[in-house]
Regions:
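Formylglycine-dependent sulfatase
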Residues: 1-174
Length: 174
């Protein structure tokens, strides 16, 4: 499974088939991860954990009930749709980058922004409480795009799409 099915399984511990999430959830679909399904974030929040999501949600955006902040995450930073532009944060003609449901206009490569936010959340958390952090990267998802320094490191690859894909993985692993 990819995208939405994998995220649904990771967050619920159930098979994506059982959840009815068998393919990526398109922006125009009026569905998401069933609101009757309890996420690990909800369980852990109830147990006193701080719960954070940095990165890609992609489990529904047609209803407010699908939003990560309504699914057990105290804080959410990233995007709710599928594959966004790595630099412009646009999906399907619309800007999709936010913090807790509020649109943010931030510049930078999304892989790096997600990683920096995850580190910030770890450093700034309440050290007296346990932490659950779900860092959900979009790399190496389409569109294939990487910083110049990462492309230069993969310059030995002749095919431009494969080079960009390898550069994205290299940047993700950095």
């Amino acid at each position: 499974p990819t995208c939405s099915p994998t995220r649904a399984s990771l967050l619920t511990g159930k098979s994506s088939l059982r959840l009815g999430v068998i393919r990526p959830i398109a922006k125009i679909q009026p569905k998401g991860l069933g609101i009757d399904e309890t996420t690990v974030a909800e369980h852990l929040k109830e147990a006193g954990y701080q719960t954070f999501l940095s990165g890609k949600w992609h489990l529904g955006f047609a209803r407010s009930e699908y939003h990560p902040n309504r699914r057990g995450f105290d804080e959410f930073y990233g995007f709710v749709s599928g594959g966004i532009g790595y630099w412009d944060h646009v999906h399907g003609g619309g800007y999709d980058w936010q913090r807790d449901g509020v649109t943010l206009r931030e510049s930078g490569y999304s892989t790096e922004l997600i990683a920096k936010e995850a580190v910030r959340l770890i450093k700034d958390r309440d050290k007296k409480r346990p932490l659950f952090l779900f860092a959900s990267f979009n790399a190496p998802h389409l569109p294939n795009d990487a910083p110049q320094k990462a492309l230069a490191a993969a310059s030995y690859i002749e095919d431009p799409l494969r080079q960009a894909h390898a550069a994205m993985i290299g940047e993700f692993d950095r």
